[in-house]
Design a protein with these regions (language model features):
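Conserved, well-structured interaction surfaces
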Residues: 1-2, 11-25, 29-47
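Aromatic-lined, polymer-binding surfaces characteristic
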Residues: 1-7, 49-57
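Short, hydrophobic secondary-structure boundary micro-motifs
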Residues: 2-4, 43-46, 75, 111-114
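Short, well-ordered helical secondary-structure segments
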Residues: 7, 45-47, 121
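Generic alpha-helix detector with strongest preference for long hydrophobic helices that associate
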Residues: 8, 43-44, 84, 154
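A short, flexible beta-alpha/helix-coil linker loop
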Residues: 8-9, 73
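Second-shell loop/turn segments in exported
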Residues: 10-18, 49, 81-89
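An aromatic- and glycine-enriched ligand-binding surface/loop that stacks and positions planar moieties
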Residues: 24, 32, 52-168
Length: 168
């Protein structure tokens, strides 16, 4: 995938494939910067919902990307480390560990039972501070997850009153 970090110009319209580590390093740096612009869950009016990005989300995503970048992946020449530099791999593991420890030590998110988490998800509960740290928000007719991944139906359903998950 060609990574575009600047607007297209006639010279950059046809970029070659970008190395995945270039993309992951950029994402790690961007997420580090983003942490200064978002609050912790329930810290302000913007982070009271799991449908808004919080510091827990940015740190969690940063940890996940760091783990992926430090590990093995399928490459055109076979399965190998994403980075051959052992020092960089250790730095990436340290980033993941520190971000996770920061989330845990702050205590803004609590872990409940599986049942409580499942019921909150089914009830479309979006209150921040529980196990779920981020959920993609859908408006009334845009939540086509069940249409895409669920059972197809031709008739209007009882919940959205739309046929085919809203694609008519």
């Amino acid at each position: 995938v060609p990574a575009r970090f600047e607007p297209n110009t006639t010279e950059t319209i046809d970029l070659p494939k970008t190395d995945r580590m270039v993309i992951m390093r950029r994402l790690l740096n961007d997420l580090l910067i983003a942490q200064d612009y978002v609050g912790w869950p329930n810290e302000n009016s913007f982070t009271k919902s799991t449908e808004r990005v919080s510091q827990t989300f940015t740190k969690g995503l940063r940890a996940r990307i760091a783990l992926f970048a430090a590990g093995y992946s399928q490459h055109p020449d076979g399965i190998r480390y994403n980075t051959e530099d052992a020092t960089e791999r250790q730095e990436l593991y340290t980033i993941a560990k520190n971000e996770c420890l920061d989330i845990i030590s702050k205590g803004y998110n609590t872990l409940g039972t599986f049942e409580a988490n499942f019921k909150a998800l089914c009830a479309e509960g979006t209150i921040a501070g529980a196990e779920s740290i981020f959920e993609i928000p859908f408006s009334a007719s845009r939540g086509r997850v069940i249409y895409t991944w669920g059972v197809k139906h031709e008739k209007k359903d009882q919940w959205t009153k739309l046929a085919k998950g809203g694609i008519n």
